[in-house]
Amino acid sequence: MPRTHKIEDYRNFGIMAHIDAGKTTTTERILYYTGKSHKIGEVHDGAATMDWMEQEQERGITITSAATTAFWNDKRLNIIDTPGHVDFTIEVERSLRVLDGAVTVLDGNAGVEPQTETVWRQADKYKVPRIVFVNKMDKIGADFDKSVESIRDRLGAKAVPIQFPIGSESNLKGLVDLVRMKAVVWDNDGLGASYRDEEIPADLMDKAVEARAYLVENAVELDDDAMEAYLGGEEPSIETIKKCIRKAVLTGAFYPILCGSAFKNKGVQPLLDAVVDYLPSPVDIPPTKGIDFKTEEETTRKASDEEPLSVLAFKIMDDPFVGSLTFCRIYSGKMETGMSLLNSTRDKRERVGRMLLMHSNNREDIKEAYAGDIVALAGLKETRTGDTLCDPLKSPVILERMEFPAPVIEIAVEPKSKADQEKLGVALQKLAAEDPSFTVSTDFESGQTILKGMGELHLDIKIDILKRTYKVEANIGAPQVAYRESLGRKVDIDYTHKKQTGGTGQFARVMITFEPGEPGSGFVFESAIVGGAVPKEYIPGVQKGLESVKDSGLLAGFPLIDFKATLTDGKYHDVDSSVLAFEIASRAAFKELREKGAPKLLEPIMKVEVVTPEEYLGSVIGDLNSRRGMIQGQDMRGNATVVNAYVPLANMFGYVNTLRGMSQGRAQFSMVYDHYDPVPQHVADEVIKKYA
């Protein structure tokens, strides 16, 4: 089947937001108005089309990025649903990698919230063009102007409204379109499908003229001809303004702000128009970078069917009907069923069996897909999240790898029976393949299975899936903090390993300089050997020895991170030296760091934001201080106070219940991992006693 839409008519975009800003409802309405969904699914009753895992329906939060294809004004929209809960930022990050543009949804009552900041920063990292939709304008206390201010203040982004609401709260009637200078009004019946243009109400005319002048001044700055004409007193045409807004979105010069209420079916169609008018097509973004599979030189792929095939696998899901599904973005070339592909990341072959176009959870079998498409492949055996698939014969490539953060929290799981043990192994293998921020390991001493993740909710949901989807009965331990260790000072260690008991002995002497590295630098090994004091073939043994012990740490068995080891000198014996002897020597040298390297225990510090009514402020701050929290500041949001603090994760377990009790359920909080910090000595002593 040949292409049905030109690649210029594609819009691959996602909807990103804080939890509860109305992201899923907005997506639902988009699917409804674009004709892909016959009934509107409400998150309130757990039936939204995009939220198709049982766990999501129950909790009313979107966990997995489902990809959906829909159509609007002859344009093809591929919508990637991204989760809004902070424990799933990995999912957001993964979907941002494959998007060309995004709609940021804000709650008109709350404005920019902590998770909005997190996903905005991630979108900055991947340079994703954005437009902003201020939702929930029907809510009591919704304030469009204040939301726009919060974008400027909290995100440091240049916000330029291209609409503003007519009426507010329960009297929300529609919006003023500042590009066309028309009022757009919805009827209250017919689920918002019918709407019409009217003249702008007289009492809003002054505001509209002022807001449009601000829009036009910012828009014409991006086009020399338009700027010249405007300075000469000529008002730009609607087409010119749209062209300039599009340029602003593509370059990040400013962000157009729209408004409405998805729940009340107002403002969604103009939002779709804006997606088509302002967000980029695959050809508007820079070519995708990659590494040539054979030469390892940097190379690029343009968004074109004529280029060699390059595909990124960005999500793996277990589907009850089809088995394992791999969601893929085709960056270049054409893919057909039956084709043999190279997984260039792992140097393995794959075959395209079934290829599906997804609509949240209905699927359509297709035979061919082209550059710009987002499809799901069934039955891939070797492919994991972040892998590249390409044509093995036409200049194979490895696209940029996605980087995933290290988990900060862990729990032990013990299956109740032998049958559960077997089911658990299979289930965990699948869950780890689907989600790179979730890892599984075995504690060698206790034999327990350890699950590691990004937060309490993240692990709760994994356990829920184990019990519900895979029917595993297991005992779950209490959550534990993923502590780390670091060196306190630079130190030289000289160690000789000698074992001579008749026959061939073992001999190796190593002199290693250990020093603390920058945060995030990981383990770095260097050899500064000159003149063959240690023969070249033995040096890998030194590195291997250090790598085998660094994760067992020095103080309490936690991985030693961010340090550099330089092999400066050593000695060997013609007969008794071997790679193994140097491996043993470097391991023993590492252990001496406990006494000589002033090791420190590190703990994950979370960035916490609590939103509380004024009357509970004292209790909230007192409680955070008692948790070793460092209060960073507070400001007002509506009639609530927002407290920002850094708090050790170890002191945040069960905080949700404490806060609920303290504020009669009226305060909320969110937290994200921020950095690792040394643990105060009196606390470190207790932790070391517990784990060592």
Swiss-Prot record:
Q: Which SUPFAM superfamilies match?
A: EF-G C-terminal domain-like, P-loop containing nucleoside triphosphate hydrolases, Ribosomal protein S5 domain 2-like, Translation proteins
What residues does GTP bind to?
Answer: 17-24, 81-85, 135-138
Matching entries from Pfam families are given as: EF-G_D2 (PF22042), EFG_C (PF00679), EFG_III (PF14492), EFG_IV (PF03764), GTP_EFTU (PF00009)
Q: Which GO terms describe its cellular component?
A: cytoplasm
**NCBIfam families to which the protein is assigned, alphabetical:** EF-G, PRK12740.1-5, small_GTP
Which family does the record claim for this protein? Answer: Belongs to the TRAFAC class translation factor GTPase superfamily. Classic translation factor GTPase family. EF-G/EF-2 subfamily.
User: What is its biological role?
Assistant: Catalyzes the GTP-dependent ribosomal translocation step during translation elongation. During this step, the ribosome changes from the pre-translocational (PRE) to the post-translocational (POST) state as the newly formed A-site-bound peptidyl-tRNA and P-site-bound deacylated tRNA move to the P and E sites, respectively. Catalyzes the coordinated movement of the two tRNA molecules, the mRNA and conformational changes in the ribosome.
Its name, as the record gives it, is Elongation factor G
Q: What does the record give as the organism's lineage? A: Bacteria, Pseudomonadati, Pseudomonadota, Alphaproteobacteria, Caulobacterales
Gene name, Swiss-Prot/TrEMBL: fusA
